[in-house]
């Protein structure tokens, strides 16, 4: 099969999924009157085969939600270089002074910032459709291949974007919450230290301590096993006069993001994507300090196979992207021990 760019097929597949419709093999193919080999031997049949394969791929992606999207700002630009620098502006420094006759207005200034380097990486995977699949008209097997391909891509994206939080280094600095807040924020000349908040008396108190250290935090990255205890703690967090506490005003059930991790087994080798450990959660300030740079998303092409291995065609997908993250700052993230 000649190399085919899947752009048109991608548009069709995503449109069908968005409209909650399905795309199945034709009745002729399912009944055996026409084999898949015969189908792809014609121009129209080849196009339908590509559309069906691409649909299965995107159906697989739909089955693995991208849970990180609430946390990151996305920058899509085909002109992104492999390596780029991002300059974070320092604080805006402004002071109001009394204006005397003939005097000048004092203009504000930008404080010193931090320059960071972002490297974009290429992530790729391939699947192969064998001659046996076509000879025996195994349409269900080809659909499984496409779905697994899409699932694997979304699993990778969740892993890449959530690892900076889950795999970050956190410490309990200082003797009290006030000291931890100072350590978390640091300065532009001297970076902060991402904080670990210890369990204190009960869950609402612990969460309240966390908000004192990271006041701008609005999202909790959690293990699914902890959802109900967290929801109960948030719902019951009230002051003596029954008015909602800081915790209840700051959080709702929709602010809890579950990630238990994932595993992918390929050729007998297991790849593990570590999730949030039950008993810990991460309070995060979304967007500002967490950016994903996307040169291009999942690009999928097919090419000639390998006759010596009876591979009819190979389908390769790849994406080029990078991340900029900063957890140790006032707009970053902290880790919270919620287990008594």
Residues of each region from the PLM?
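Intrinsically disordered, low-complexity terminal tails
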Residues: 1-44, 339-340
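Assembly/oligomerization interface modules of large self-assembling protein complexes
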Residues: 40-123
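Internal, hydrophobic cores of structured domains that mediate oligomerization or house catalytic pockets
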Residues: 104-126, 130-132, 140, 146-153, ...
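Glycine-rich, charged/polar anion/phosphate-binding loops
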Residues: 113, 204-208, 300
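Alpha-helical scaffold segments that mediate packing/assembly in large oligomeric complexes
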Residues: 125-210
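Short, aliphatic-rich beta-strand segments
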Residues: 125-129, 219-223, 313-323
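A contiguous, surface-oriented mixed alpha/beta subdomain in the mid-to-C-terminal portion of proteins
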Residues: 169, 176-182, 196-252
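Sequence/fold signature of self-assembling virion shell proteins
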Residues: 231-340
């Amino acid at each position: 099969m000649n190399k085919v760019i899947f752009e048109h097929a991608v548009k069709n597949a995503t449109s069908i999924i968005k409209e909650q419709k399905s795309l199945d093999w034709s009745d002729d193919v399912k009944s055996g009157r026409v084999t898949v080999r015969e189908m792809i031997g014609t121009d129209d049949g080849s196009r339908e085969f590509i559309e069906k394969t691409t649909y299965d791929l995107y159906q697989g992606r739909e089955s693995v939600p991208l849970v990180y999207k609430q946390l990151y700002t996305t920058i899509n630009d085909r002109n992104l270089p492999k390596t780029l620098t991002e300059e974070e502006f320092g604080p805006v420094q402004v002071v109001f002074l009394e204006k005397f006759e003939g005097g000048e207005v004092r203009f504000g200034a930008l404080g010193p910032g931090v320059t960071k380097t972002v490297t974009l990486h290429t992530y790729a995977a391939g699947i192969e459709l064998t001659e046996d699949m076509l000879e025996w008209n195994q349409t269900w097997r080809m659909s499984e291949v496409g779905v697994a391909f899409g699932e694997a891509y979304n699993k990778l994206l969740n892993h890449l974007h959530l690892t900076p939080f889950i795999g970050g280094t956190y410490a309990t600095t200082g003797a009290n919450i006030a000291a931890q807040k100072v350590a978390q924020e640091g300065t532009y000349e001297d970076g902060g230290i991402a904080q670990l908040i210890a369990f204190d008396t009960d869950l609402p108190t612990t969460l309240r301590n966390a908000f004192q250290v990271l006041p701008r935090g609005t999202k909790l990255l959690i293990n699914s096993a902890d959802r109900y205890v967290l929801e109960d703690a948030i719902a019951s967090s009230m002051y003596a006069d029954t008015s909602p506490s800081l915790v209840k005003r700051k959080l709702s059930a929709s602010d809890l993001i579950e990630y238990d991790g994932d595993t992918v087994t390929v050729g007998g080798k297991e790849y593990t994507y570590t999730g949030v450990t039950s008993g810990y959660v991460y309070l995060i300030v979304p967007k500002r300090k967490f950016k994903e740079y996307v040169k291009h998303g999942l690009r999928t092409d097919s090419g000639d196979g390998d006759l010596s291995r009876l591979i009819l065609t190979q389908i390769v997908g790849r994406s080029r992207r990078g991340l900029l993250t900063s957890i140790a700052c006032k707009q970053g993230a902290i880790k919270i021990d919620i287990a008594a």
